[in-house]
Amino acid sequence: NYPFYAQAASVLGSQLVRGRATSVGNVINASPLADTVTPLVACDAKLVVVGPEGQREVSLVSWAGESQEERIARGAFFIFVRKVGLKPGEMAIGLKIPYVEGQKAVFTKFDRRKEVDLSTVCATVGKFGEDYRVAIGSCAPTPIRLPKTEALLKGKKLTPELIGEAAELAGSEVSPISDVRASAEYRISLV
């Protein structure tokens, strides 16, 4: 039901890492360039945690343009680079990934090498019911969804013109940094 998640998992790290890593571990790491996180964000997945106050589900979705304070206020999991919304004593025990009948999505990763490289940009784009969802990694302090781009696409049939318009809008919604992997401008062009 989630071939786009399998696509992301197939390019995660080395074969040794893929054999030892867990999906929850990749989420808990809270890296904005974690390959398997954008498919989960696109699916509206929730992290299941347990702690002194019992069990709860925490949203993995962060929105483009959302501040740390806004993420904390709504109880999001990803707050900033390697900063998460777990309460003291809480531990992750699983993921809850909703399924939408007929969902279709694709994962893509841009990097400098074919294997064992961190993402320059990674993305999951798909249609879930009537909604299009666009999740981007490596272009903000957390993996993010692009609400303006999603709103533009909602309920519409894709055409080359609409895709071009959505791509332009998506580039304007991200705010990447320049680092050793790529300049901010290059990342925006990839989006």
Cite the ranges covered by each PLM segment.
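C-terminal structural segment of proteins
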Residues: 1-191
